[in-house]
């Protein structure tokens, strides 16, 4: 039951192309790939902590340099009781719905890097202690 209230490593690499008069060479350089980062917010209109986050911390975060460098998606249900219904989930995000689990609370965030969930957090405390720091680290 949802209530109001799996880290994967990222393999990083990039290709550096060096152009000289004699030849073109490619070299793989570990650690230089920046993942495509998506932040998925899941909440409900009748959830007080969700409204609080939307009105304060989301507004502050939306003006940050990190926010400008990620893709932000929202799942906002009119009611907590209907949060998991198909009409609240765009088709391309439904695969993440199963990751919420029966004990999940909202507000909830999934940090997704290159289509892999690498951080899950619930509630304002985990937003500040886990989710936001993970986003900042990924986007450095």
Residue locations for each model-derived region?
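Short, internal strand/loop/helix patches
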Residues: 85-105
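The canonical Cys-X-X-Cys-His
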Residues: 47-51, 109
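Extracellular/periplasmic catalytic domains that process cell-envelope and extracellular macromolecules
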Residues: 33, 66-67, 101-105
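Bacterial N-terminal signal peptides
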Residues: 5-19
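Non-catalytic, surface beta->alpha helical segment in thiol-disulfide oxidoreductase systems
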Residues: 103-140
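Thiol-based oxidoreductase modules, predominantly thioredoxin-like and allied folds used
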Residues: 66-91
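Short active-site neighborhood of thiol/selenol oxidoreductases, capturing the structured segment around
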Residues: 34-45
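Typically the conserved alpha-helix immediately C-terminal to a functionally engaged Cys/Sec
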Residues: 50-66
């Amino acid at each position: 039951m949802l209530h109001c209230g799996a880290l994967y490593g990222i393999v990083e690499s990039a290709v550096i192309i060096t152009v000289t008069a004699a030849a073109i060479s490619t070299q793989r350089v570990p650690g230089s790939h920046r993942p495509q980062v998506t932040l998925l917010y899941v909440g409900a209109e009748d959830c007080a902590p969700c409204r609080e986050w939307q009105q304060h911390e989301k507004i502050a975060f939306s003006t940050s340099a990190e926010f400008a460098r990620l893709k932000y998606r929202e799942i906002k249900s009119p009611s907590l009781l209907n949060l998991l219904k198909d009409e609240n989930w765009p088709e391309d995000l439904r695969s993440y719905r199963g990751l919420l689990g029966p004990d999940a609370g909202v507000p909830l965030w999934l940090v997704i890097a290159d289509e892999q969930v690498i951080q899950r957090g619930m509630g304002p405390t985990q937003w500040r202690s886990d989710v936001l720091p993970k986003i900042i680290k990924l986007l450095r």
